[in-house]
Amino acid sequence: LDVLCRSGALDNLIDDRFTGRKHFWAAIAKERPRKEKNLDENIEMYAEMGDFTKEEVIHYLADLTGVFPVSLVVNDQIRKRLASLQENGQAPDISDYDPEEPLHHNGRGQAVVWFIPRKVNVKKTKKGKAYYDVEVTDSNSGAKRIKCWGIDPQRDLIHVNRPYLAALDYSPDWGFSTRALYATFKILG
């Protein structure tokens, strides 16, 4: 019941007694009522909960269904912009990147791709320097990782669940990486 509520599968059961999806979830799944009286008490007790935030909805849909809700993150303007680039063979989804395709690269030989960061992990090298290990997805729900070397965690911020266009280095052995996060990552929208 919990997963069905958080993934939106029970949205058609929400009526005017509930102030939102989070209120509905709390009243029926968080503290499951045994009788109709208990349901009425839960509805009253959790009334201030309202709705899930956009970030919570994205998180639940991605984690519970296994499909990232790109339509909640990429608006029509960004979608059109990406489509026009992709019509010319440029800026593919990160999971569609082909190292042999010349149009997928900029003048410096870097891979130009778009993606949506899902999680940013701060890690340390053997010498104690911080770097990001960024878990990303795209419209294909393809999961990839990007290593961002030489970062300053106070200055170099990556917003999760926001679309980015980036020029990245690519190695078949190591995958995607960058050494200049502030210069290579461009947030879209």
Task: Tell where the protein language model's regions lie, with residue ranges.
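Short, charged beta-turn/beta-strand-edge "cap" motif at the junction between a beta-strand
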Residues: 168-174
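Structured catalytic/nucleic-acid-binding cores of DNA maintenance enzymes
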Residues: 1-9, 134-142, 164-168
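Hydrophobic core residues within well-ordered beta-strands of beta-rich domains
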Residues: 111-113, 132, 164
